[in-house]
UniProtKB/Swiss-Prot annotation:
Residues 135-145 have a biased composition (Basic and acidic residues). Residues 135-167 are annotated as: Disordered. Residues 43-54 are annotated as: Interaction with NGFR. This is Novel acetylcholine receptor chaperone. Disruption phenotype: Mice show a complete disruption of the assembly and function of the neuronal acetylcholine receptor (nAChR) subunit alpha-7 (CHRNA7) in the brain. Exhibit enhanced locomotor activity, profound abnormalities in spatial/working memory and a significant reduction of assembled nAChRs in the brain. Display thermal hyperalgesia and mechanical allodynia accompanied by an increased number of microglia in the spinal cord dorsal horn. Exhibit elevated basal serum corticosterone accompanied by increased anxiety-like behavior and an impairment of long-term memory. It comes from Mus musculus (Mouse).
Length: 167
């Protein structure tokens, strides 16, 4: 049977991957939701207006929206279907992307309810990455503890003669 750690990583990977495939698809095409697509177009126009450096670099709102959407779809597919280290790389890229989106929301002065989902999914991506990168076997770090009180040396045996060790 799979360990709880493995099940947690798999569940987070699939859920996060599907979410980012969905959100990336909304940024790329109006087929899923015309309202959400038009809202994304409006939001990305405000992001480019708020950050003139993007315009100077030749990045318009369409290019920014489609680039972010394509990256979300690609990383979401990797998170959902590809095993091993590529999941961690996709997780890292999505985490950077979420941080950029949070920056954009703060830049244009959006209220918390407009970017709360980005905060939540950023936290979930961070948790998944921390759980996945944590070493599997921690038993080597733990010392074997005596099982009964008879096996444990008393404080009097550990302390020098005539002194009691107080901890």
């Amino acid at each position: 049977m799979a360990s709880p750690r493995t099940i947690t990583i798999m569940a987070l990977s699939v859920a996060l991957g599907l979410f980012f495939v969905f959100m990336g698809t909304i940024k790329l095409t109006p087929r899923l939701s015309k309202d959400a697509y038009s809202e994304m177009k409006r939001a990305y126009k405000s992001y480019v207006r708020a950050l003139p450096l993007l315009k100077k670099m030749g990045i318009n709102s369409i290019l920014l929206r489609k680039s972010i959407g394509a990256l979300e779809v690609a990383c979401g597919i990797v998170m959902t279907l590809v095993p091993g280290r590529p999941k961690d790389v996709a997780n890292f890229f999505l985490l950077l992307l979420v941080l950029a989106v949070l920056f954009f929301h703060q830049l244009v002065g959006d209220p918390l309810k407009r970017y709360a989902h980005a905060l939540v999914f950023g936290i979930l991506l961070t948790c998944r990455l921390l759980i996945a990168r944590k070493p599997e076997d921690r038993s080597s770090e733990k010392k074997a503890l005596p099982e009964s009180a008879e096996e444990q040396p008393s404080l009097y045996e550990k302390a020098p003669q005539g002194k009691v060790k107080v901890s």
